[in-house]
């Protein structure tokens, strides 16, 4: 009887799905209240005027308006604001 010894099982073969992070609306674009501006891990971008921050650090518009990105303060923080239209 021909026998073949069992091959070892690999410990590879797993991968996580991409999380689709990043800037969703850019400076100068018009956005509706509740619209997502940035999806991020941690605060790469900080909320400015009329921008809220979600539990997962997502930045969203609180009012309808135009998006403005800026670098502010001593720490050169990147902020996102919405100017009401």
Swiss-Prot record:
Biological process (GO), any one: translation
Keywords: Ribonucleoprotein, Ribosomal protein
Region ranges (Disordered): 1-22
Molecular function GO labels: structural constituent of ribosome
Any single Gene Ontology cellular-component annotation: cytosolic large ribosomal subunit
Recorded superkingdom: Bacteria
Family: Belongs to the bacterial ribosomal protein bL27 family.
Protein name listed in UniProt: Large ribosomal subunit protein bL27
Species assigned in the record: Nitrosomonas europaea (strain ATCC 19718 / CIP 103999 / KCTC 2705 / NBRC 14298)
Gene that specifies this protein: rpmA
């Amino acid at each position: 009887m021909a026998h073949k010894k069992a091959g070892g099982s690999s410990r590879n073969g797993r991968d996580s799905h991409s999380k689709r992070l990043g800037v969703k609306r850019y400076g100068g674009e018009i956005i509706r209240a509740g619209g997502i501006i940035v999806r991020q891990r941690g605060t790469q971008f900080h909320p400015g005027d009329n921008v809220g921050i979600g539990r997962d650090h997502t930045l969203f518009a609180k009012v309808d308006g135009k998006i403005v990105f800026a670098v502010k303060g001593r720490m050169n923080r990147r902020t996102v604001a919405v100017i009401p239209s």
